[in-house]
């Protein structure tokens, strides 16, 4: 609404096309995903539709607010689903159970549980940002999003907790394989691997790190890390 006020009487041909593709998969997903277009002027929609039909098979017209919420909901939905897995992983961790085993048995012959994803680091420049944007849009009443962030952001602490259960862990070489927020990218924004790395440094541990997409002066090869790491 603030942007609409700023642009009022300045550009009636403004069209908003929210981006919903997975990072590093744009050339694969752009031709497959429906393209949402939001605007107030019919002629602007028709001209933008003509453009996007060159790369998209389906065009869906919405209001600007609908388009923005669809984008935010898409990422918040994924972020919350990952938080469910991470919360269940946390419960297993606190009870000395193997979450992967529990999850596999849950899903064995039981199709209704197949939507439960693996646990793990959930971050990056989109999922967290859009979930928090919804929180601020709702004047901090998006409690589910806040709870999801609390769960997901705590996973590095659980790893530290598991590490401390190893005998003489302070004398071990700790290998951290992967520094970016996800695989096949050099993007470290909001990466929980970096959060974990900083926590390990504060413990004054011997740390080895490797990421084939994100090179640092302290980085070594994946093979060398695996060969030299104790944990």
Describe the residue ranges of each PLM region.
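Structural/interface elements that position substrates and couple domains in central-metabolism enzymes
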Residues: 1-231
């Amino acid at each position: 609404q603030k942007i609409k006020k700023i642009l009022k009487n300045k550009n009636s041909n403004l069209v908003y096309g929210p981006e919903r593709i997975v990072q590093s998969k744009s050339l694969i997903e752009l031709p497959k995903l429906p393209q949402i277009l939001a605007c107030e002027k019919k002629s602007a929609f028709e001209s933008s539709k003509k453009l996007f039909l060159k790369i998209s098979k389906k065009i869906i017209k919405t209001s600007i607010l609908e388009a923005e919420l669809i984008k935010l909901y898409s990422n918040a939905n994924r972020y919350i689903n990952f938080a469910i897995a991470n919360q269940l992983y946390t419960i297993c961790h606190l009870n000395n159970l193997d979450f992967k085993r529990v999850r596999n048995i849950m899903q064995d012959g039981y199709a209704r549980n197949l939507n439960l994803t693996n646990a793990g680091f959930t971050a990056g420049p989109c999922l967290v940002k859009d979930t928090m944007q919804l929180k601020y849009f709702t004047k901090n009443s998006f409690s589910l999003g806040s709870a999801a962030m609390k769960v997901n952001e705590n996973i590095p602490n659980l790893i530290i907790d598991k590490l401390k259960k190893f005998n003489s862990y302070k004398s071990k070489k700790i290998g951290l394989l992967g520094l970016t927020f996800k695989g096949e990218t050099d993007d470290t924004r909001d990466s929980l691997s970096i959060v974990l790395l900083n926590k390990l440094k504060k413990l004054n541990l011997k740390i080895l790190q490797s990421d084939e997409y994100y090179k640092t002066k302290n980085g070594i090869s994946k093979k060398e890390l695996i060969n030299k790491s104790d944990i």
